[in-house]
A protein has these predicted regions:
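NAD(P)+-binding Rossmann beta1-loop-alpha1 motif at the extreme N-terminus of oxidoreductases
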Residues: 1-48
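Fold-independent oxyanion-binding glycine-rich loops
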Residues: 10, 33-34, 53, 78-80, ...
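General beta-strand structural signal in soluble alpha/beta enzymes
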Residues: 77, 102-107, 147-151, 209-210, ...
Length: 291
């Protein structure tokens, strides 16, 4: 059955998802902040709301939409990161504003450019509401995107957020020409660091080795289609954070996520050494060769 899907965010990811599901026969409407339109208009005649905005825009958008949210409208959160003020994930932000809403998370090794090209991929729909996850899995099936489900949205979002930081570190490693041994060691320890965050936040250890954990890390930390990886390459070339972001020319979640996660770690006594090094480099404490 065709769904009426509203997508918040017309960036690369939101646009890709909209085209993917439109090609699968669903009815799509897409909102962008640049349009100047009231996002609440998307709540009407809608079966599923999809949030694909950058992390920096989630809190404001959730607050604006909460007073108008239909009781039975589910939300699929597709943003990856940690809010620097609330120190929580995108779906958790939405849940705070919509305490009664059914919410799921979409995450996995999904480089938007490859999906646009019709290349195959797989992703996870995670929710504490198993019935919702299974329903969305069936409804959102697409020719080139296979969907799985899990019941661990906390671990899924933690992995999706911190892998961006690891991708920055991987870009630095490759940009400095440190070799395959160093890269493999970095990703191995990066995976362990993601596991530390998942466990500390109450997620499941099994999530670490699935599509949302290892799968997403491998894709993001090894491809120049990844903005976070390219950002790391620019840092290795000697760019500071501002210049590197300017050269990317689009949202890069890694820097903000690294700082937010490190604040969480400091408050709770968690040890996240790679994240610490990335933040130290961003703050100018040392250059990429020393990190």
């Amino acid at each position: 059955m065709a769904l009426r899907i509203s997508v918040l965010g017309r960036g690369a990811w939101g646009s890709t998802l909209a085209r993917l599901w439109s090609d699968s026969g669903h009815q799509l409407q897409v909102w962008s902040r640049r349009d100047g339109n009231d996002p609440a208009t998307l709540l009407h005649d809608c079966d599923l709301m999809v949030s694909a905005v950058a992390m920096a825009g989630v809190a404001d958008l959730a607050a604006r939409l909460a007073p108008h949210w239909p009781r039975d409208l589910p939300l699929l959160s597709c943003s990856k990161g940690i809010d620097p003020d609330a120190l929580c994930s995108a779906a958790q932000l939405w849940q705070r504003h919509l305490p009664g809403a059914a919410i799921a998370v979409l995450s996995g090794p999904n480089l938007a450019t490859e999906l646009e090209q019709g290349l195959p991929a797989a992703s996870v729909i995670a929710s504490s509401d198993q019935a919702l996850a299974l329903r969305l899995q069936k409804q959102l099936v697409a020719p080139h995107l296979r969907l799985y489900t899990n019941g661990d949205p906390i671990g899924t979002e933690a992995a999706g957020a911190l892998k961006n930081v690891m991708a920055v570190a991987a870009g630095i490693s490759d940009g400095l020409g440190l070799g395959a041994n160093a890269k493999a060691s970095l990703l191995c320890r990066g995976l362990a660091e993601i596991g530390t965050l998942i466990g500390a936040l109450g997620g499941r250890s099994s999530t670490l080795y699935g599509l949302a954990g290892l799968g997403d890390l491998l894709a993001t930390a090894n491809s120049e289609l990844s903005r976070n990886y390219r950002f790391g390459l620019r840092l290795a070339e000697g760019c500071d954070e501002t210049e590197a972001l300017q050269r990317i020319g689009a949202t890069v979640e890694g820097p903000s996520t690294a700082r937010a996660v490190l604040r969480l770690a400091a408050a709770h006594g968690w040890r996240l050494p790679i994240t610490e090094q990335v933040v130290g480099l961003l703050s100018g404490e040392f250059d990429a060769t020393r990190a």
